[in-house]
Amino acid sequence: MNRIVTLLLATLVGLPAMDAGAQSSHKYPPIEEYLMARDAEIKLARSAAPAGISDRATIKVLTKSGFEVAQQGDNGNVCLVMRGFSAPTYTPAQFRDIVHDPTIHAPICFTAPAARTALPYYEMRTNLALAGKSPDQIAEALQAAYATGKLPRREAMTVAYMWSAHQHLGSGIDAWHPHMMLFAPYYENSMVGGNAFGSVLPQVSDDAGTPFTVVVVPVDDKLAVRMQ
């Protein structure tokens, strides 16, 4: 579920590969299918992390023009609900097309450092998708934005929480394990144990060997956060 994710946590639990050729020929569903009721989205976003992280976080919600602040926080953390727009930019290639899936809801809370360096990337991905750009066009735009400094440099690892009990990461997946997202620039899977695709974690889930690499680390299922 970008990343989404992100949302590619689904890859780690055996989600069948999409037919990329078929998906890429489709237009995006209407934006209305991606939107949620505002209050419900705020509650879902806060469920991404424990209260100590999310209670004083800034909450953003998706609109037809991108994410906007719904509630201003004061601790530097930012929580929102990622959609399929947060798919990997490069790899695994077969999951780039989950941008077309409006059912994905992936609550995430970016800690303050991640909000500064990783969140702008996900917001740009979302805006490009809302503008109708294809996965290839999104990748080209992000690569150019990073190279020219329009996106913040990723020079250190940062983290985000995805602990919600109410995740929906893809058809047949729904709520996966609560987990941490490590934004680990240029990491390869061999650097986190080399665990085979679909086996035990941690693993690189998105965009290995690039500035946008994501490593997924699960936590105890008992830590899953429910909406209040």
Question: Can you name each region flagged by the protein language model?
Answer:
Residues 24-228:
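Primary mode marks residue(s) on the alpha4-beta5-alpha5 output face of response regulator receiver
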